[in-house]
Amino acid sequence: MHQGFFLLFATVSVVTALTLVLARNPVHSALALMACFLQISAIFVMLGAPLLAVIQIFVYVGAIMVLFLFVIMMVDVREAVLQRFMPGGNLPALALLLLLGTEMVVLVLWSDRFIESPPVAERGGDAIRDLSKTLFSDYLLPFEIASVILLAALVGAIVLARKEPG
Amino acid sequence: MVPLWWSILLGVALFVIGAGGVLLRRNILIVLMSLELLLNSVNINFIAFGQYYDDFRGQIFAIFVIAITAAEVAVALGILVALVRNKSTLKVDDVTIMKG
């Protein structure tokens, strides 16, 4: 049951990711990416991280995809629709990718470390409380730095996208 | 329970697809979306290993990755809007003015 759902979500996420890369129209790519993020958040639930799944939906599907669609709406994508998918001269990149992918798959399947199924973690219902206690005590400084980075990115995005005066 | 290597293989598949999008596509918007996909595949690995070792640090790293990704997308799309206003192109190959 569990594994069947995992296989279903994984298959759909891989298919939508392929759609994202192969689609000619950027709007179709954005919608495929949204579907892929939903599948990935379902996988987060199955991996025992419901908080991350909610954050994934809020941040990616709610904020980042809306940002992407706004930018697609602002710029003219008609020229981009007409261009070919794969201009020539990309064979080295493709070969490198295939090599990298096969290497990762072979290394994962080679080692018997990952084959055994995980120890059943019997944690109480307070996993999110423990997570936030760890986040706000041990990782407080990185958390604050991340908030400062977000503020800097906010200001930077406004400055970059503003019309030059005069 | 789902075995760990299933999650890792899913991460590998999404990573390779996203890297293919970054390397093979010439549209800046699709390159940025493929970058999102790459970061998400890394998140899957973080969370899978965090569950496997029963450790919170996987989820905490994933939260930081999501925060930094949001910042990156905001800045990248700001740059994209400024670029389109000045140069009116969406192809990566046309943006080579910093090449000496």
From Swiss-Prot, chain B:
Belongs to the complex I subunit 4L family. The keyword Transmembrane applies. GO terms for biological process: ATP synthesis coupled electron transport. Its EC number is 7.1.1.-. PANTHER family: NADH-UBIQUINONE OXIDOREDUCTASE CHAIN 4L (PTHR11434:SF16), NADH-UBIQUINONE OXIDOREDUCTASE SUBUNIT ND4L (PTHR11434). It catalyses: a quinone + NADH + 5 H(+)(in) = a quinol + NAD(+) + 4 H(+)(out). Gene3D superfamilies: 1.10.287.3510. HAMAP family: NDH1_NuoK. NDH-1 shuttles electrons from NADH, via FMN and iron-sulfur (Fe-S) centers, to quinones in the respiratory chain. The immediate electron acceptor for the enzyme in this species is believed to be ubiquinone. Couples the redox reaction to proton translocation (for every two electrons transferred, four hydrogen ions are translocated across the cytoplasmic membrane), and thus conserves the redox energy in a proton gradient. NDH-1 is composed of 14 different subunits. Subunits NuoA, H, J, K, L, M, N constitute the membrane sector of the complex. It is a multi-pass membrane protein. It is found in: Cell inner membrane. Its main location: membrane. Disulfide bonds: none annotated. It holds the Pfam family Oxidored_q2. InterPro entries: NADH_UbQ_OxRdtase_chain4L/K, NUOK/Mnh_C1-like. Keywords: Cell inner membrane, Cell membrane, Membrane, NAD, Plasmid, Quinone, Translocase, Transmembrane, Transmembrane helix, Transport, Ubiquinone. One of its GO terms (molecular function) is NADH:ubiquinone reductase (non-electrogenic) activity. The chain crosses the membrane at residues 4-24, 28-48, 60-80. One of its GO terms (cellular component) is plasma membrane. This is NADH-quinone oxidoreductase subunit K 2. It comes from Rhizobium meliloti (strain 1021).
